[in-house]
Amino acid sequence: MELRHLTYFVAVAERLNFSRAAEALHVAQPAISQQIRALEQELGISLFDRISKRVTLTEAGRALLPHARQILSAVEAARSEIRERGTLKRGTVSLGAPPTVSAHFLP
């Protein structure tokens, strides 16, 4: 299961429309369909009922949705934290103190 699969799944599940999900993610609609199909094949179950142009979540799709959201949220939180650590300034701090002060306060 790839993060892209979950991203596309959540987008379609929230919009109940493959074309709108593709538009929101700035990808072609066939790419969305292909990735959803790959996810369904991997899981061995349909996540969406497709009736004409209407799309609804199956029971399995409804069960997966909160987990997919949680996974994507956790990944974004991890990325944010790592980016923040990359922007922290690093270096050496030198302190100067008279010998009487440093003997008491500095190791």
Features from the language model and the residues they span:
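A short LG(V/I)-centered, amphipathic sequence patch enriched
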Residues: 40-57, 62
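Residue cluster at the C-terminal edge of the helix-turn-helix DNA-binding motif
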Residues: 15, 24, 37-46, 72, ...
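N-terminal winged-helix
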Residues: 29-30, 34, 73, 77-80, ...
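Conserved short C-terminal alpha-helix that flanks the catalytic cleft of nucleotide-sugar-dependent
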Residues: 65, 82
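Hydrophobic two-helix hairpin corresponding to the core of helix-turn-helix DNA-binding domains
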Residues: 9, 21-22, 58-61
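Short alpha-helical elements of helix-turn-helix
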Residues: 1-15, 29, 33, 62, ...
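Short helix-boundary/capping micro-motifs
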Residues: 12-28, 52
